Amino acid sequence: MKEIEFDLLTEPWIRVRLKDNTVQEVSLTEALVSAQDYVDLAGEMPTQDAAVLRLLLAVLFTVFSRVNVEGEPEPLEKRGQALRRWSELWQLGHFPAEPIRDYLEQWKDRFWLFHPTHPFWQVPEAKIGTEYSAAMLNGEMIESKNKPRLFPLYAGQSKEQLSYPQAARWLLSVNSFDTP
């Protein structure tokens, strides 16, 4: 792959449920800095939500284990410090945007869905295995050529295609829950 495409930090791809019960796609950055505005994650399946939540928590744990609520460097050294820090974040009512943005900016080249050397959540050098269509990435499909699904959610060409936001969500889900 030669092209860099679909920035997960700025492009909307994480499905969230708003307080009025509508569902909207937001970027990774937006999901973190505006988390207080969302009721829930709203992916295609609960396991997909768990996989996305795992990524969101990994970013938050990394950021706030290194900086305090004011964004000043203060690495956690003891368990009690971690509990106090998360209590302070809870009392604040939102995650401070600047430390999150700073951390994500530092690693922005790792958040491209398509990238020649650092594709998100993928190993470009992996040549072992079998090539599959997009349908194999989609956890809602679960059918084979000889056993089609009785009441499919997707039909025709849409069975073989995923939008970039869908591909990002399913990539996380498959890597979290699909076992060899």
What are these regions (language model features)?
Residues 1-154, 158-180:
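Conserved small-residue
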